[in-house]
Amino acid sequence: MNIPSLFVDPFSPLLEHPTEQRAKNVAHAPKRPCNLTQTEKMLAVRNALRYIPKEHHVLLATEFAEELNTYGHIYGYRFMPNFDLFAPPVSEIGAHCEQASAIILMILNNLDKRVAQFPQELVTYGGNGQVFSNWIQFRLVLRYLYTMTDHQTLVLYSGHPLGLFPSTPDSPRMTVTNGMMIPSYSTKELYDKYFALGVTQYGQMTAGSFCYIGPQGIVHGTTITVLNAGRRMGLDSLAGKVFVTAGLGGMSGAQPKAAKIAGCIGVIAEISDTALLKRHQQGWLDVYSKDLEEIVNWIKEYREKKEAISIGYLGNVVDLWERLAEEPECLVELGSDQTSLHNPFLGGFYPAGLTFEQSNQMMTSDPVKFKKLVQNSLIRQIAAIDKIAAKGMYFWDYGNAFLLECQRAGANLLREDAQDDKSFRYPSYMQDIMGDIFSMGFGPFRWVCTSGKPEDLRLTDQTACKIIDELKDTDVPEYVKQQYLDNKKWIEEAEKNKLVVGSQARILYSDRAGRVALASAFNELVKSGKVSAAIVISRDHHDVSGTDSPFRETSNVYDGSAFTADMAVQNCIGDSFRGATWVALHNGGGVGWGDVINGGFGIVLDGSSDAARRAEGMLNWDVPNGVTRRSWSGNAKAQEAIQRAEKQVDGLRVTLPVEADEELLKKLKF
């Protein structure tokens, strides 16, 4: 990788078109719908030309118009580097500000072809999780970061670099917003228009905040979910038990690895041979077949042997569920789905009866018919799931809007006693499993060793084990100790499980006390020189405080506030002035555009006392914020956790709820 070339002026001289790179065999995003009027298409080109010096307008106006017609979006492919991107050792970046070098490393990792779903379209995961809207923005952002000082802050509006603004060393080096819309215009239909115009983008969660660490990020969460789903069924061991699901993409590709780690038989449907083969070649998917009879035979064989294995079905998930529903016996104990149903009609879900290629063509050539086929397939899929669930399978929604889109397609999924429109017969994994884990304050904390050295990551793993050992012996409830034990097992086996894809990164579900201790210990490792370069700490937006999402992260909030977004917005504001190196606030992520508000952060631990101070101050807000909100909604585990935190954190005093007597309320007349 030619790192210095990433920081040159892309207009003087004008960069050559990266012909060799464009010709490489990588997965590409489907053509996007472009239902713009002639005037709006002119506006889209005009908007892109704003970045370009006037002398290049004639040439690039034609290029941009051709891209808009061909791909449904102006990606500015000319400005894409003519080589593969990846996260190099931070010492090779050499920006004027060390914190900015670390941010550049994180951006490059999000566009690594081993990590990103559609690297040339700047999509990291989820089908449309953009890092930037176009490659011109990529170039300008890297130039700004390379030259900035620690008295400046870079501001990004949905990928667009607004510029560098004066600030202080304690301020964030970068603030990011993605997809912030006037609420009544935050619809999926209008998103297509405004993305085509180049004025907003869908950053998913860690795609647009530059904190993605490859599928490892969701392996841990999926492992925890599968283990706890088994516990809900009274299973101490998942040996010989079958978990059926769908998706082997950027995030969902974690499922076969998680199934093996959990000790069960994972069966995962995937219609894209590129996505499936990527996981097979990576070693995360053991075997695969296009033949449903072979799939069923493998399931029966490994159920009998009680051996863990990951099995891929190269075909449509609807066909898999319907075939399994034909079996007289229940072959499936656990079921879910991780297709990208936040984006159901533009590549997030592929209907039965069409090939992958036919679907990619029809979704733009005949979107009305394609939508009908998708919804018919969802009806068929949930009907097959109903049949197997009636035999004893435990099925849950993985927060990808599966049940929501089935309901929108016409399926009757509400419970008989439902008091709202989100109380489905099948639970969200947040309601049954992860909600309580978040309420305890545990969530997907992560770190990146910017040296790029495996030995540095190994030392952080060992340090994390020691900290967990200390925490599990403190005065905490047994259910909290169980979380510590689960997470210690994860970190002990992390290197053996070969989870690193891209940067030298690790994820660990941790609570407030754990995160504060980890940040302090990591900063000391950098200060002492035991770790050879700065460590970036971050988390998924899908966390205790980071996301307001009534169909996922806050689906177990029952006081009527699940459809509000104060928590996520306040979290980003609070992180920004408490010490984050960068912060991000997004519309969408997980369930989809208009249905979620979420945010994240990054902190660079450089071994300084300032870094230690900032990390402690910020982490003592970033977790308790969400625990307090969950406590206020009535969650008992959150109430215990926040009262315990009040005794440990100076200055922390929260408002605790007083529960009303149910019989008193029933006597009231309205």
UniProtKB/Swiss-Prot annotation:
Database matches in Pfam families: Urocanase, Urocanase_C, Urocanase_N
One of the GO BP terms on file: L-histidine catabolic process to glutamate and formate
Binding site for NAD(+): 126-127, 204, 250-252, 270, 316-317, 338-342, 349-350, 398, 590
Cofactor(s) listed: NAD(+)
Highest taxon in the source lineage: Eukaryota
Main EC class the enzyme belongs to: lyase
Keyword Secreted part of the UniProt annotation: no
EC number in record: 4.2.1.49
Coiled-coil features, chain-numbered ranges: none
Molecular function GO terms recorded: urocanate hydratase activity
Reactions the enzyme catalyzes: 4-imidazolone-5-propanoate = trans-urocanate + H2O
Pathway membership, UniProt: Amino-acid degradation; L-histidine degradation into L-glutamate; N-formimidoyl-L-glutamate from L-histidine: step 2/3
Keyword Lyase in annotation: yes
Family, similarity comment: Belongs to the urocanase family.
Protein name stated in the entry: Probable urocanate hydratase
Protein source organism: Caenorhabditis elegans
